[in-house]
Amino acid sequence: MTIGIIGAMEEEVELLKNSMPSVEEIVIGGAKFYVGEVAGKEVVLLESGIGKVNAALGTTLMADRFKPEVIINTGSAGGMAEGLAVGDVIISDRLAYGDVDVTEFGYTYGQVPRMPAFYQGDAVLLKKAETIYREYFAASENKAVYGLVVTNDSFIMRPDQHETIRTFFPDVKAVEMEAAAIAQVAYQFDIPFLIIRAISDLANQEATISFDEFIHLAAKQSATCIIELLKTI
């Protein structure tokens, strides 16, 4: 089984890359692929670049060239739900775009025409993750939560951005900039996927400071959770 793992930034894939005993690096159209083993599993690790287009391009190349049987997205996110703290992990059961609006033609806000309004994470992988992380976080000050992640081509920190997202997605747990695009490509290629992100900031006016300070912690939390999951796949 080949497992595809995608992170947007070098910081988000570094720990996983460094855990590979040997690595083959392949660059296609600016997307950096690292082929090797993680936790004894054959892995294609992608550093896609930031944003929806980079994520979709890289995921499409991965699906076409490397034929992964599962795709997992790692990285950081901004927490939107009450009670979330930096270092907590969000496992997404649903994903949506927060900056797509063709409601004039009868579509749901966030829905790309002829695509689902929400992309569903793989139920089997979600169940595995839930079982593993309940035990993993039992002795930790952090926690794993499950729910809706909303993707925007913007770094979310302003009150007006919050208001728009909460108006259309009142149950949103976290926001970030790639996951729904990855999910859409996985959906179109019929590849099971799972989104695992760690909270680097609380998507507020202190978000830029928090992100810069805690991106490495968030990347470590997310990558460590993925390694634990790989042991069970």
UniProtKB/Swiss-Prot annotation:
Q: Does the keyword Thylakoid apply?
A: no
Per the record, its GO cellular-component terms are: cytosol
Catalytic activity field: S-adenosyl-L-homocysteine + H2O = S-(5-deoxy-D-ribos-5-yl)-L-homocysteine + adenine; S-methyl-5'-thioadenosine + H2O = 5-(methylsulfanyl)-D-ribose + adenine; 5'-deoxyadenosine + H2O = 5-deoxy-D-ribose + adenine
Q: Name the catalytic site residues.
A: E12, D201
One Pfam assignment = PNP_UDP_1
Question: What are the GO MF terms of this UniProt record?
Answer: adenosylhomocysteine nucleosidase activity; methylthioadenosine nucleosidase activity
Record's keyword terms, sorted: Amino-acid biosynthesis, Hydrolase, Methionine biosynthesis
Tell me the Gene3D superfamilies matching this sequence. Nucleoside phosphorylase domain
Give binding positions for substrate. G78, I156, M177, E178
Q: What biological-process GO terms show up in the record?
A: L-methionine salvage from methylthioadenosine; L-methionine salvage from S-adenosylmethionine; nucleoside catabolic process
Taking the record's annotation, the residue ranges forming a coiled coil are none
Report the pathway entry.
Amino-acid biosynthesis; L-methionine biosynthesis via salvage pathway; S-methyl-5-thio-alpha-D-ribose 1-phosphate from S-methyl-5'-thioadenosine (hydrolase route): step 1/2
**Which Enzyme Commission number(s) are listed?**
3.2.2.9
The similarity comment for this entry is:
Belongs to the PNP/UDP phosphorylase family. MtnN subfamily.
Report the protein's function. Answer: Catalyzes the irreversible cleavage of the glycosidic bond in both 5'-methylthioadenosine (MTA) and S-adenosylhomocysteine (SAH/AdoHcy) to adenine and the corresponding thioribose, 5'-methylthioribose and S-ribosylhomocysteine, respectively. Also cleaves 5'-deoxyadenosine, a toxic by-product of radical S-adenosylmethionine (SAM) enzymes, into 5-deoxyribose and adenine.
Q: What is this protein called?
A: 5'-methylthioadenosine/S-adenosylhomocysteine nucleosidase
Q: Which source organism does the UniProt entry give? A: Listeria monocytogenes serotype 4a (strain HCC23)
